A protein has these predicted regions:
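Short, hydrophobic/aliphatic alpha-helical segments
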Residues: 25-30, 305-315, 457-463
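Short hydrophobic segments within beta-strands
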Residues: 517-519
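Catalytic-core signal marking the mid-to-C-terminal active-site face
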Residues: 2, 36, 349, 355-513, ...
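Catalytic alpha/beta active-site cores
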Residues: 1-258, 289, 330, 470, ...
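Ordered, soluble secondary-structure elements with a strong preference for glycine-centered loop motifs
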Residues: 94, 263-264, 340-341, 528-532
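Active-site capping/gating regions of soluble enzymes
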Residues: 250-444, 597, 619-628
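Structural signal for hydrophobic packing residues in well-ordered secondary-structure cores
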Residues: 23, 27-31, 104, 130-134, ...
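A general structural motif
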Residues: 309-310, 548-554
Length: 645
């Protein structure tokens, strides 16, 4: 086709009904509903979104306009630059100083480090760190009172950024809700910090602990809003105005693996936050609260750890499309032992690549106008607001934590996520599918244990008076005081599969070889699909396989078992081969080797199933099976008895 002819071409308008008809034809008789996706938020994602999906969405047309769904600033990152705040890990303050200097030279523009690892930091060492002109982004967690005391005693007049903690979420992970004593000390510290460092945000509303406990996007947004209400109302009782409280707020989220949901989560939060501010008559610049995000630890795996680079890259991308101000990327080998220099470098470079090569900071709200994202944002906002009101009607976040209802709801979502991974409804490359049996495992980094003083203090000023040059954060740590509740427990999604692999490594360390046999019936082209499937399933549990030659008779199958002497075998073939060989194969196998366990790949018709079971069949390996349960029972074969050496 010539260029002039190409220019003359046009695309015919296609109606929705025509599209549906064509789509249904491609599904070969299946309903179009097969293309719909149910999310953990109980929302339904459609395969196609049109302008009609935005008919009931009342949205502003531009960023920087209330309700700020498209961003707080008209110029996006051009007006309010992204701050990369890679959280550095270091064994000592000296090491931390060196890493901070290197990070700044490499392009990092906010200082952040794991304060738990720096509990041995002295006041003198802290003062030296504060000499940097760059903003801080530090979640102090258990060390807020001690670290803020250091800051107040130091000479750091230009201090800015975020240095704070979330008393509610931090205590919840410990199985506590703060009592009046803990809250009063916290307010004293906030008051002193506000007077001394007005540019520092000291109330970090951190939803990450809930995210790590399995929370969906609706729950995360609702919890963030409910925590904000708690802090505003409590500080009002202490004489603060809502505006004074909000000016100290910084929200911190984790962005997970559901890319578009995470983008919509951040956009929906801004919309609802604006609505909440309106209810407190807060407007203007005060509404433009600081929002930070970290890539999710929940989605990371020790297994095939380099895949984590893809996960964190996608999650960082979602965070930037969502318009966060601070961004932290987790190193890909965070849970494989001491973080490598390569992982640190990759984590620091991902935001730089998204800025300098993808130019995300040059486009204001790239997600704006997408029928899908705008519609999803609206649905998410409506559902999250309803959930927020439900929490408030139940007495607020403290009440639902005390009652245990929130923890129960989080546990239900977490359980569903794990089950979906176990039955391969969801895939995690290298973890529940395409596992690499040859990769090397590393022990989880435990760091240097520091004994915290856990001191009781009657007032914050008493703590301030105890600061001296060589006093450490650990020595100034204040005892947590609160009412016991069910803990908000953190768990990574991959942990159950990691535990299976660690069991396998332990078995091998005892001198045993974990190997199973596949009895393959018929020709290669007939048994290969099921043999490959079983091989993949067993590898996720750390079990390697030896595949038999083509077995065209019961005698050949028996000979393979006799030669290998494994404790476990799986018969693989087409359904026709199962019918041809019949239960007699099973009976002969068990007669010769009664101690072995034998499964069948796939499922049998009900009529044949009973005969095979009667002949000695132990079970099946099939799609949709709970792999965690199956593999756990199989590993017990090697843990409990002699195995092939």
């Amino acid at each position: 086709m010539k260029m002039e002819e190409m220019k003359a071409q046009s695309f015919d308008h296609v109606s929705l009904e025509e599209w549906k008809k064509t789509a249904e034809a491609s599904l070969k008789g299946k309903s179009l509903d097969k293309l719909h996706t149910e999310t953990y938020e109980q929302l339904t994602l459609k395969p196609l979104y049109l302008k009609a999906d935005l008919e009931h969405v009342e949205e502003e047309q531009f960023p920087g306009v209330p309700a700020y769904t498209r961003g707080f600033y008209k110029g996006g990152y051009v007006e309010q630059p992204l701050k990369t705040a890679h959280r550095l890990q270091a064994h000592s303050t000296t090491d931390l100083q060196a890493k901070l200097s290197a990070a700044i030279e490499a392009g990092q523009d906010a200082l952040s480090f794991s304060i738990e690892e720096q509990a041995r930091m002295t006041f003198r060492e802290c003062s030296e760190l504060l000499a940097s002109p760059y903003p801080l982004y530090i979640n102090t967690k258990a060390h807020f009172l001690a670290f803020s005391a250091f800051l107040l005693k130091a000479d750091a007049a230009e201090l800015q950024g975020v240095v704070g903690t979330d008393l509610l979420s931090h205590f919840a992970t410990k199985g506590l809700v703060p009592d009046e004593q803990a809250l009063a000390l916290h307010v004293e510290a906030l008051t002193e910090m506000k007077q001394r460092y007005p540019k520092v945000k000291t109330i970090v509303i951190d939803t990450v602990p809930y995210h790590l406990a399995g929370a969906n996007a609706i729950q995360e947004i609702a919890i963030a809003l409910s925590e904000a209400v708690f802090y505003i109302e409590y500080l009002k009782e202490k004489g603060w105005t809502p505006l004074e409280a909000v000016q100290l707020f910084s929200f911190h989220f984790a962005t997970g693996s559901q890319f578009f949901m995470e983008v919509a989560k951040l956009r929906a939060f801004r919309k609802l936050w604006t609505a909440l501010c309106e209810s407190y008559e807060i407007e203007g610049e005060a509404v433009k609260v600081t929002i930070g995000a970290e890539t999710s630890e929940f989605t990371l795996s020790k297994l095939d750890r380099h895949v984590n680079i893809l996960r964190t890259g996608s999650e960082a991308f979602a965070a930037m499309l969502g318009g966060v101000e601070y961004l932290q990327v987790t190193p890909f080998d965070q849970f494989n032992g001491t973080t490598s220099a390569l992982a640190e470098r990759v984590a620091k470079n991902i935001p730089l690549i998204l800025q300098s090569e993808s130019h995300l900071t040059k486009v204001v709200d790239p997600a704006g106008g997408s029928y899908f994202i705008e519609s999803l944002t609206n649905e998410l906002a409506q559902a999250a607001w309803e959930k927020f009101l439900q929490i408030e009607e139940s007495g607020g976040l403290l009440s639902v934590l005390k009652a245990g209802t929130l923890q129960q709801e989080l546990a239900q979502v977490l359980e569903q996520r794990i089950v979906d991974l176990a039955v391969r409804k969801k895939s995690m490359i290298g973890t529940n599918i395409y596992a690499d049996l040859n990769e090397t495992f590393f022990s989880e980094y435990e760091g240097m244990e520091v004994l915290l003083a856990d001191r009781p203090v009657s007032s914050y000023k008493e703590l301030l008076n105890q600061v001296s040059e060589e006093r450490t954060l650990a020595e100034l740590h204040v005892r947590d005081s609160g009412e016991p509740v069910i803990p908000v427990k953190s768990q990574r999604l991959a942990e159950p599969f990691e535990q299976l692999r660690e069991r396998a490594v332990g078995i091998q360390a005892s001198g045993k070889t974990i190997e199973a046999g596949l009895i393959c019936l018929g020709k290669l082209k007939d048994f290969k699909p099921r043999a490959d499937y079983v091989t993949g399933v067993l590898s996720t549990g750390g079990i390697s396989v030896q595949v038999s030659n083509e077995c065209h008779s019961v005698e050949e199958a028996l000979q393979f078992v006799q030669n290998t002497q494994f404790p476990y075998y799986c018969i693989c073939g087409k359904d026709e081969a199962y019918t041809e060989f019949g239960p007699n194969l099973m009976a002969e196998l068990k007669q010769g080797q009664p101690a072995i366990q034998v499964d069948l790949a796939g499922k049998l018709p009900e009529g044949e199933q009973a005969e095979w079971l009667a002949a000695g069949l132990d079970g099946h390996v099939f799609a949709g099976q709970n792999l965690l349960d199956k593999l756990s029972s199989l590993l017990a074969l090697w843990e409990g008895g002699a195995t092939h050496e």
